[in-house]
């Protein structure tokens, strides 16, 4: 059985890990980095760049470089958080036919799971290159406060990337696994995982217990905000710089996509620098121009100034902590350890706020960028049977129920219920002789049905006519270990049943997912062909260069016919290299190699003669010693050019 890898699919960065000989290993990508930017760029020629190469070209291709797409995954276009992002993002967020928020790239509408799938494919390839075998199964993490649609969309992204998602687990829970797995301290421990990432915030209260030699991780409560993260901190700084620049220069950078992209990079860098220094300078020459000429942006930002800009965001993260502790039935003083996860938790002011709230120093022995992927890999090893000393009990973050008479939400499963779980309740009809009922499934905490997230609806028909209140309709909610909901309704009189796996009232249909999987496979084939073409081109160019050099050095030692033949072969090869036909490039390279064979022989003879001439000056020149000559066959090793 192949390895089940662990993937932290982050808003800003992603990371992949695997368990080897019982130890988690974070795998470096092809650029040598342990984390990969969750950035995908769509080039004019159809090529798709992922990670650092995509991020590097963002300034010149801002409209087609997608970052933070996780903030849109499983979301409706109308949601206020999406509307807010429309004004901030350089790329175009559009309404899909099903009402979801999609992204328009070069005139083609793409679903956020398709974009996330490109990042997942890079993670899959990173693991395959390291392990030397195909990887088909993964555990993928999501923010604990993700709702059903967002979890389903993440699972879809895995499928599009060619991965069977064995389990979706919550990021703070994964971090707790990474933290608690190899801790030797005995006794129960209650920990708080404060996870402030690039786009989302989660707080989970988790109890780690030793039960008969088995480590049990039980999530007591979770809370969060799926639209609060490092991207928002960056945006506060960008807004401040734009406002100040407008005051000084009278130019509004908000309308200049390229300037904003440069500013985003600079703001992110400044934010990181301010975690260790008290002041930083943003220096962007030629940021824009007006009638008076080019404008340069130079601005000093102090740590105190930045902290004042984001103070309210940090405060926003503390309220969910209060709620989570209350929901867990604990006091702040009951928490034994606080773990910080997510890149934004490195900010000193964030650490200070966490320390003040919990009354203790957060732990420093967890890598905020890697802990989540490590935990996912540990869970993968449990699912594959490699580890048997661990039990994970997670919870559903939000209450689930159905809409009942008067537009009220009736809850069947309360938030923070341990999963997997099942709940059944009997309902009846609202009108006399009603022959059908619509089951409207909701997720959220509000009494008013319309104020909660609609997950989908389905009909149960052919109910025998009867006075209102008489028919008995049994509704069952079943949440699996991924936190994904299955709902069924049954008329107890007839036994007739209707059910759905919630794919959200929006979401991708099975046909759409399968089409995206096929497109992705097609893309992979195209990528392979492109790589082979580039390799053939590189080898041909290398040969052309070396033959040209040899011709310049030794051309006078061959006949004019021979020389003309080589020059013609060079010209043919140069023409072939300009084209897109791999077979033609290889054929013309072969012809050039044959045509230049005579030239190679002359070069070799010349080199040998020079070597002998040099050797004649040595004392033992001319002595022949065959005693230690080893017969060997030499094989030309063609090294692939990158």
Curated annotation (Swiss-Prot):
Residues 608-642 are annotated as: Disordered. Keywords: ATP-binding, Chaperone, Nucleotide-binding, Phosphoprotein, Stress response. Residues 608-618 have a biased composition (Low complexity). It comes from the Bacteria. SUPFAM superfamilies: Actin-like ATPase domain, Heat shock protein 70kD (HSP70), C-terminal subdomain, Heat shock protein 70kD (HSP70), peptide-binding domain. PROSITE patterns: HSP70_1, HSP70_2, HSP70_3. It comes from Laribacter hongkongensis (strain HLHK9). Coiled coil: none annotated. The lineage of its organism: Bacteria, Pseudomonadati, Pseudomonadota, Betaproteobacteria, Neisseriales. The modification Phosphothreonine is found at residue 200. Belongs to the heat shock protein 70 family. This is Chaperone protein DnaK. Acts as a chaperone. Induction: By stress conditions e.g. heat shock. InterPro entries: ATPase_NBD, Chaperone_DnaK, Heat_shock_70_CS, HSP70_C_sf, HSP70_peptide-bd_sf, Hsp_70_fam. One of its GO terms (molecular function) is unfolded protein binding.
